């Protein structure tokens, strides 16, 4: 059965000068410790991936590791509106201007050979989720800004 791309609705508003952010809400592989998961992502997966991302136009890539110790800090922030803590182990955010660039990266033979298999070593790919949206930036480096910096 061949894969066919889904129909994409037309975008609302101007996207000139805007960047997309792919957010992967990740879970670690069952049985893997939080520290082993973080270690693999930071010290094994990231070094293998970051050069390829630059090659395909990625503007920024970050990992936010939500270990038990940092999730416990949420108790200091709870209020009547914010009281539910997300249980994801990591948020990985990839920023790029054109979705076609990211698609080409995933089709790169090196990505296919090295990174797809690596994901299976640390990630619970059946439970992890993702979403994508346009970045609207308001504060950068302690300064008020009008939009994401396009440099």
Curated annotation (Swiss-Prot):
Single GO term (MF): monooxygenase activity
Class of enzymatic activity (EC top level): oxidoreductase
InterPro entries: Dimeric_a/b-barrel, EthD_dom
EC number assigned by the record: 1.-.-.-
Domain of life: Eukaryota
Biotechnology: Notoamides have been shown to exhibit antitumoral activities. Notoamides A-C show moderate cytotoxicity against HeLa and L1210 cells with IC(50) values in the range of 22-52 mg/ml, but the IC(50) value of notoamide D is greater than 100 mg/ml. Moreover, notoamide C induces G2/M-cell cycle arrest at a concentration of 6.3 mg/ml.
Family to which the UniProt record says this protein belongs: Belongs to the tpcK family.
The name this protein goes by in its record: Probable decarboxylase notQ
């Amino acid at each position: 059965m061949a894969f066919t791309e889904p129909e994409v609705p037309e975008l609302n508003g101007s996207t000139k000068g805007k960047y997309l952010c792919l957010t992967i809400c990740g879970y670690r592989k069952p049985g893997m410790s939080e520290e082993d998961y973080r270690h693999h992502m930071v010290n094994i997966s990231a070094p293998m991936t970051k050069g390829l991302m630059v090659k395909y136009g990625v503007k920024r890539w970050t990992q936010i590791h939500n270990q038990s110790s940092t999730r416990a800090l949420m108790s200091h922030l709870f209020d009547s509106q914010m009281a539910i803590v997300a249980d994801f182990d990591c948020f990985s955010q990839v920023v790029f201007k054109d979705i076609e660039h990211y698609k080409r990266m995933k089709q790169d033979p090196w990505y296919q050979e090295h990174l797809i298999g690596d994901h299976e070593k640390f990630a619970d790919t059946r439970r992890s989720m993702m979403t994508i949206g346009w970045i609207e930036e308001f504060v950068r480096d302690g300064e008020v800004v009008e939009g994401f910096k396009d440099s």
